[in-house]
Amino acid sequence: MSTSNRILLGVNIDHVATLRQARGTRYPDPVKAALDAEEAGADGITVHLREDRRHIQERDVLLLKDVLQTRMNFEMGVTEEMMAFAERIRPAHICLVPETRQELTTEGGLDVAGQEARIKAAVERLSKIGSEVSLFIDADERQIEASRRVGAPAIELHTGRYADATTPTEVADELQRIIDGVNCGLNEGLIVNAGHGLHYHNVEAVAAIKGINELNIGHALVAHALFVGFKGAVAEMKALILAAAKA
């Protein structure tokens, strides 16, 4: 667990695959995007293999497992299909996320407190393959404490409410919620990551929170890459979060 100013950047490449799937082509290649991201300073690559396969495909994950120089953070729903696939590929990191077919993107955190037995069984099973398991949850004390009880070594705090806040008061309130969540997670002995909806204009305040280990960012990078290229987009984000963490 890192409580220093060293903060990691996990690059989510799902939306490179979204662009590919929109036309059913072989391009753009998310694997190339991952390699470019690593070259530009990414500390890890995040992919979410959804039940509906709307972006990332099994083939992408298998190729990434073979070629990544950093590490894969494999996001997945708590289903038997995904559990079996994770056991097959044995990623370095696994993040359990909620998932519904209708959502545009992951809309909220996993309800760990409401299904502790199920999540504990999943954490135990996935830990046996050597993966570090994290839980994508809201910055809520009840969920954080439940995450510790089920045996997860790490959590990823959902920053979507902060990203969606529109007034200065809302932004301040949601940022404080994240700060409190980070402190609660650290007090519970957990590694604390964060992500969802972060972009170039809101990431610095989150990156400045002491105790956050890693930020996972995707859509904003892919969007900015249209104008500056993927390596440039990743390098700019990495510079932003490192500068904010040192401030």
Curated annotation (Swiss-Prot):
GO cellular component terms? cytosol
Q: Which InterPro entries match?
A: Aldolase_TIM, PyrdxlP_synth_PdxJ, Pyridoxine-5'_phos_synth
Q: What is a single molecular function from GO for this protein? A: pyridoxine 5'-phosphate synthase activity
Indicate yes or no for the key word Cytoplasm: yes
EC annotation? 2.6.99.2
Q: Which Gene3D superfamilies match?
A: Aldolase class I
Pathway assignment reads:
Cofactor biosynthesis; pyridoxine 5'-phosphate biosynthesis; pyridoxine 5'-phosphate from D-erythrose 4-phosphate: step 5/5
Q: Which positions bind 1-deoxy-D-xylulose 5-phosphate? A: 14-15, 50, 55, 105
Binding-site residues, 3-amino-2-oxopropyl phosphate: 12, 23, 197, 218-219
Catalytic activity reported? 3-amino-2-oxopropyl phosphate + 1-deoxy-D-xylulose 5-phosphate = pyridoxine 5'-phosphate + phosphate + 2 H2O + H(+)
Q: Say where the protein is mainly found.
A: cytoplasm
Xref: Pfam families: PdxJ
Q: List the active-site residues.
A: 48 (proton acceptor), 75 (proton acceptor), 196 (proton donor)
**Record has DNA-binding as a keyword:** no
Q: Name one GO biological process term.
A: pyridoxine biosynthetic process
Domain of life (superkingdom): Bacteria
* Compartment(s) of residence: Cytoplasm
Q: How does it assemble?
A: Homooctamer; tetramer of dimers.
Give the protein family. Answer: Belongs to the PNP synthase family.
Tell me which PANTHER family the record gives: PYRIDOXINE 5'-PHOSPHATE SYNTHASE (PTHR30456:SF0)
So what does this one do? Catalyzes the complicated ring closure reaction between the two acyclic compounds 1-deoxy-D-xylulose-5-phosphate (DXP) and 3-amino-2-oxopropyl phosphate (1-amino-acetone-3-phosphate or AAP) to form pyridoxine 5'-phosphate (PNP) and inorganic phosphate.
Protein name per Swiss-Prot or TrEMBL: Pyridoxine 5'-phosphate synthase
Q: List the source organism.
A: Pseudomonas fluorescens (strain SBW25)
